[in-house]
């Protein structure tokens, strides 16, 4: 099969290989084509560095896959630099490089002036005149880059979702400026932001110094929606999602918002509030869901299905079931929804009364089938 190898210069090399070729063979083929010794080649696929003894098949490399070739300098090594935003920069260095050289390489890659860089390794700040070897920094070590602003400081802003944003500020910045910086980073308009520090809401016209906010302080960001409100959605894994909603939003809209945040298709979502499953066509206000209410999200597995139960009053109940559920289970679900004890329920499908011990599949009840519920009164026959 053919695979492609892309170099850092943007050149693409085409190789003829077998899935059973090991990475060493592939490096030999690259040497034949490009003259680069195997010991200077690092091959990357799907973000992983490939090991010489493993085969292409081991890494699920198939025809027309693209590998990335990074050169490893003789006597040189690669190190990683991790920023507070979580971005990782890869640098080619020598053990004899001093910290000043390393900062210059970071400036070349990221445009950050050396005098604004603080490099940390093993909990120590690195001094410009010392070398990587002085600090025992070896290949594939990770340094941490913290920005030092002239006269400035870093503060943290924590959102209700648990995300932490890092901001570069001055003590003289007013709260309005801080909200503008948050808008730059996160796209949240200032008029929807409420900032809290030490339990107090911060006023736009005051400065950070007025509130004694110092370097590495943490502010809390709460969103204020125009006419809207925040609600929480708790999943079975214990994760809590924060949503911005209006009381007039219907449940379908809410499921769409959850899909945007979490990628879960609406038809796999069941939302529960105050013990009731919420129906798509109804609104949050219909269920008296108010600001900071918590809904519970239960996933409906693709193996499951919905069926309908129609009462003599004409009301239709929607149930989440499996084909393997027995009729007793179904009656228990109806009791959960409607409060009708199972011993007062008679369920009819296709003209037949359904028996407790049998399953939905036994009666060929499929998705979106409609059962009829007839009440059997106590003392009745």
Curated annotation (Swiss-Prot):
Compartmental location: Cytoplasm; Nucleus
- The answer to whether keyword Hydrolase applies is no
The propeptide segment or segments lie at 381
Q: Where is the signal peptide?
A: none
**GO cellular component entries:** cytoplasm; nucleus
Q: Which PANTHER family match?
A: UBIQUITIN
Tell me its family.
Belongs to the ubiquitin family.
The entry's protein name is Polyubiquitin-G
User: In which organism is this protein found?
Assistant: Dictyostelium discoideum
Taxonomic lineage: Eukaryota, Amoebozoa, Evosea, Eumycetozoa, Dictyostelia
Q: Which gene encodes it?
A: ubqG
């Amino acid at each position: 099969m053919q695979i492609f190898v892309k170099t850092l210069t943007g050149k693409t090399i085409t190789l003829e290989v077998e899935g059973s070729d090991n990475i060493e063979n592939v490096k030999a083929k690259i040497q034949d084509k490009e003259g680069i010794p195997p010991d200077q080649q690092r091959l990357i696929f799907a973000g992983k560095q490939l090991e010489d003894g493993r085969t292409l098949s081991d890494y699920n490399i198939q025809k027309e896959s693209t590998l990335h070739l990074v050169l490893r300098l003789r006597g040189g090594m690669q190190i990683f630099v991790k920023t507070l935003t979580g971005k990782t920069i890869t640098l080619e260095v020598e053990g004899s490089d001093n910290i000043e050289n390393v900062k210059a390489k970071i400036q070349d890659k990221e445009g950050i002036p050396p005098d604004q860089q603080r490099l940390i390794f093993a909990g120590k700040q690195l001094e410009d005149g010392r070398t990587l070897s002085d600090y025992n920094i070896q290949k594939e070590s990770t340094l941490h880059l913290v920005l030092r602003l002239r006269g400035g400081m870093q503060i943290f802003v924590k959102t209700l979702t648990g995300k932490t944003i890092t901001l570069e500020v001055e003590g003289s910045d007013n709260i309005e400026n801080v909200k503008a910086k948050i808008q730059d980073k996160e796209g949240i308009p200032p008029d929807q932001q409420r900032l809290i520090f030490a339990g107090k809401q911060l006023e736009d016209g005051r400065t950070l110094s007025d509130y004694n906010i110092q370097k590495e302080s943490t502010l809390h960001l709460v969103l204020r929606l125009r006419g809207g409100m925040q609600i929480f959605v708790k999943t079975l894994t214990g994760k809590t999602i924060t949503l911005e909603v209006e009381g007039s939003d219907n449940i379908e809209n809410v499921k769409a918002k959850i899909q945007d945040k979490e990628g879960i298709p609406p038809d796999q979502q069941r939302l529960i509030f105050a013990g009731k499953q919420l129906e798509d066509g109804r609104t949050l206000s219909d269920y008296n869901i108010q600001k900071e209410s918590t809904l519970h999200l239960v996933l409906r597995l693709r193996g499951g299905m919905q069926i309908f139960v129609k009462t003599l009053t004409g009301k239709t109940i929607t149930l989440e079931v499996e084909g393997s559920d027995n009729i007793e289970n179904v009656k228990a679900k109806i009791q959960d929804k409607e409060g009708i004890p199972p011993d007062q329920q008679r369920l009819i499908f296709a003209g037949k009364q359904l028996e407790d011990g049998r399953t939905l599949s036994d009666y060929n009840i499929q998705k979106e089938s409609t059962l009829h519920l007839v009440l059997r009164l106590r003392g009745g026959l």
